[in-house]
């Protein structure tokens, strides 16, 4: 099964002397190479990411958790296997329908897991996760998103320069468009989005309108659980006529063009709150080597976070996990290079199964960066 391919992680390197950073410098995939990196800010890492490479396809997942690590860790273990299951029903081909079914099935599985496990998993009932998926199948790239992680393409423009093109749709209620959409879906609820603690929030609690998990915003049965109320006191006041958060992803498909579509940056919002789309694309395109490029993105974001708080980057390294969350969020970045040939993809003609158990490999970020380097933690 695919689940066993997605355990562990490739040989890691500390990001400088910072025990809260990690990277996998460069690894091959079906249509090129990829680089991964992460930086931990929370007491327990809430971001997760993974890349599965097989001869016929490449899958990229970035899962930005909130309210604890449970939902993002669940996605790390279940999303790729679900894609495999639904793709197998269609002869092995991945497409938008397969991806949508996998998102919704993952959300339902998480809900059922909690129903079976309460009160032992009450902490997990307060957890949710944004979910960003990239799937390269032949010469087509699918990008699916629920939440506010982001995928940005580095594309060669007519004049030869590399420009940024955003590929994902975000669902953060900081956007007036997202707030209007949510209000239209809930015309009888004047408090479906409120401004609380300095930001717009769904029911005054979370900032995203789409996510996996956050079950207390989808069904009233969990808000009544005493343990859930202890973990998320605001849940007790939530009145639900219907779910106010959904796992429905926004999905975009793109035919890849050789020599034009160069690379894609997949990252959690911890990166994007400090780097613009254009800044990230320029950093990647101007790097002298691909090796370690994701770590350079993460370091650039950390440098900007330090600058905003008027501290030196070296001082930021000495701030412990948990406390560091006051300076930046967990940050995860995956840079996927697209080495395409003239007919659309180095292996575009291989349109067999999405995955092959004999030749697939899966790379993950660590469950917890601090614990990776501190085995007694």
Swiss-Prot record:
Transmembrane regions: none
Q: Name one Pfam family in it.
A: PP2C
Cofactors per UniProt? Mg(2+); Mn(2+)
Which reaction does this chain catalyze?
A: O-phospho-L-seryl-[protein] + H2O = L-seryl-[protein] + phosphate; O-phospho-L-threonyl-[protein] + H2O = L-threonyl-[protein] + phosphate
Q: Name one GO molecular function term.
A: metal ion binding
- Asked if Transferase is a keyword of the record, the answer is no
Enzyme category, top tier: hydrolase
Q: Where does Mn(2+) 1 bind?
A: 64-65
Any one GO biological process: regulation of intracellular signal transduction
Q: Which domain of life is it from?
A: Eukaryota
Family indicated by similarity: Belongs to the PP2C family.
Recorded protein name is Probable protein phosphatase 2C 61
């Amino acid at each position: 099964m695919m689940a066993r391919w997605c355990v562990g992680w490739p040989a890691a390197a500390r990001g400088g002397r910072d025990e809260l950073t990690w990277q996998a410098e460069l690894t091959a995939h079906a249509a090129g190479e990829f680089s991964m990196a992460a930086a931990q800010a929370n007491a327990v890492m809430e971001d997760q990411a993974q890349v599965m490479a097989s001869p016929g396809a490449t899958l990229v997942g970035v899962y930005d958790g909130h309210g604890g690590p449970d939902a993002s860790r669940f996605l790390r273990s279940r999303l790729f296997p679900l894609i495999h299951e639904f793709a197998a029903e269609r002869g092995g081909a991945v497409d938008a329908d397969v991806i949508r079914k996998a998102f919704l099935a993952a959300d339902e599985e998480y809900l059922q897991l909690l129903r079976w496990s309460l009160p032992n998993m009450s902490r997990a009932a307060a957890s949710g996760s944004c979910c960003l998926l990239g799937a390269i199948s032949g010469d087509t790239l699918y990008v699916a998103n629920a939440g506010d992680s982001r995928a940005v393409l580095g594309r060669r423009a007519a004049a030869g320069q590399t420009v940024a093109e955003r590929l994902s749709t975000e669902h953060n209620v900081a956007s007036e468009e997202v707030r209007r959409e949510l209000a239209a879906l809930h015309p009888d609820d004047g408090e479906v989005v409120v401004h609380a603690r300095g930001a717009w929030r769904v029911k005054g609690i979370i900032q995203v309108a789409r996510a996996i998990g956050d079950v207390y915003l989808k069904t009233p049965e969990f808000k009544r659980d005493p343990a859930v109320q202890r973990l998320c006191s605001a849940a007790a006041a939530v009145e639900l006529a219907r779910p106010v958060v959904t796992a429905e992803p926004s999905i975009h498909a793109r035919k890849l063009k050789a020599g034009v579509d160069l690379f894609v940056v997949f990252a959690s919002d911890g990166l994007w709150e400090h780097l613009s789309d254009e800044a990230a694309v320029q950093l990647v395109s101007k790097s002298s080597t691909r090796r370690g490029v994701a770590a350079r993105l993460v370091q650039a974001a950390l440098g900007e976070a330090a600058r905003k708080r008027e501290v030196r980057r070296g001082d930021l390294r000495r701030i412990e996990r948990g406390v560091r969350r006051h300076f930046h969020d967990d940050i995860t970045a995956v840079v996927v290079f697209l080495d395409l040939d003239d007919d659309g993809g180095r292996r575009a003609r291989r349109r067999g199964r999405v995955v092959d158990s004999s030749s697939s490999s899966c790379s993950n970020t660590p469950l917890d960066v601090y614990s990776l380097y501190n085995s007694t933690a």
